[in-house]
A protein has these predicted regions:
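Cleavable N-terminal signal peptides of Sec/SRP-targeted secreted and luminal proteins
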Residues: 7-23
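Short amphipathic alpha-helix with an adjacent loop that forms part of the alpha/beta core around
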Residues: 225-235
Length: 365
């Protein structure tokens, strides 16, 4: 009987240990957007390991994330993540600090409501990020609004101030004026005391940009916009162009830009090929063309960008001077539909992904 009792005890212990092992393994897993290279129908939600924390990294429990053009390109195999970064989609996230890695400062604590620029990994339940890139979610802002800030607002801020060097009184031409970056850029131009003109693909999108502060808007589907831009600037042209289109807009951009203008190229939605008398026109107008991206920039550069943004722009979200523009939200399980919507150019502003579908749980861990 004693032997039977011992065997039963051992069996129960084995069962308990096995259950604990399964539970521990499960605790280290998370849901995340996964994909097979191709169309938006190839996106799905799968179980993957939670990210491990490195030196000075914070683990965010993600409430909301968002999608960007870069995500759709990565899904197609055209824009891989930088070396060493997560291959999970998502360049921004909002949530709470779940844990802190070795070497973190005392600036952040577990439970803090934060948003962050990411190099990848945002479309998941947890994401690791350098603590230097964390930003506090402004008072009174929910997670959906917060997820619409990091990638597009920091991109627009970089384009205008770190690269384009926009000055008070200048005029900026913003292509894709109703996109996430576009709606942020329009507001940032006004904040800088400059004037913006936008292009967009519908009157409704132009109306949105104008409501945010754009002085004029032109429908690129209705012919050459460059003469309209010249008319709007009394023949001078614009001082700065924020160009996400590239090749197909070259001639019109060249006509619309002022002498000594700064042309900031950050996307190639219209292709990367141009032909003809390219350099002579640039020389005649003394135009400077700068290509730029943000995702592959160094941590030092991104940290400086985040620090400047927090000082110069973040307070204006609290005052209501600027605001993130949300088009719609999708649950993580419907991320394929979100990609499809973006690729059909249906959105004005941001498409947000809800990982936790209860926007009232602001402090839940």
């Amino acid at each position: 009987m004693v032997e039977v009792h011992v065997l039963v005890q051992r069996y129960i212990l084995c069962v308990l240990l096995s259950a604990h092992a399964v539970s521990s393994a499960t605790d280290k897993m998370m849901r995340a957007a996964q994909f097979e290279k191709g169309g938006p129908e190839n996106l799905y939600v799968g179980e993957v390991a939670r990210p491990a924390l490195g030196e000075r990294q914070a683990l965010i429990k993600v409430h909301t994330s968002a999608i960007n053009r870069a995500d759709t390109l990565q899904r197609k195999g055209l824009y891989p993540p930088p070396p060493g970064e997560s291959d999970i989609l998502g360049l921004e996230a909002a949530g709470v600090v779940d844990s802190l890695g070795p070497g973190c400062s005392e600036k952040w604590k577990i439970g803090d409501r934060v948003m962050s620029l990411l190099s990848g990994g945002g479309n998941s339940e947890y994401v690791a990020t350098p603590e230097q890139l964390l930003m506090p979610i402004p008072e009174g802002m929910d997670y959906i609004q917060a997820a619409a800030i990091p990638e597009v607002w920091l991109t627009a801020y970089q384009l205008l101030h770190f690269v384009g060097k926009v000055q008070t009184g200048e005029t900026v031409l913003i292509h894709g004026g109703a996109s996430g970056v576009g709606t942020a850029a329009v507001q940032l131009v006004s904040l800088a005391g400059a004037k913006s003109i936008v292009t967009a693909g519908s009157e409704a999108k132009i109306a949105t940009a104008v409501s945010l502060g754009a002085s004029k808007g032109f429908n690129y589907k209705e012919g050459d916009f460059s003469q309209k831009v010249l008319d709007a600037t009394n023949g001078k042209g614009v001082d700065v162009i924020l160009d996400c289109v590239g090749g197909s807009y070259y001639e019109q951009n060249m006509n619309a830009i002022a002498v000594d203008g700064r042309w900031v190229l950050y996307g190639l939605m219209g292709g990367g090929t141009i032909s003809g008398d390219v350099f002579a026109k640039l020389l005649r107008k003394r135009v400077s063309v700068t290509g730029t991206t943000l995702r592959a920039r160094s941590l030092e550069y991104k940290s400086q960008l985040v620090g400047s943004f927090m000082q110069e722009v973040l307070p204006h979200f609290i005052s209501g001077k600027v605001k993130p523009i949300i088009f719609t939200t999708f649950p993580l399980e419907k991320i394929g539909d979100a990609h499809k919507m973006m690729e059909e150019n249906k959105n004005t502003g941001k498409i947000v992904i809800e990982v936790i579908q209860d926007r009232d749980k602001k402090d839940e861990l």
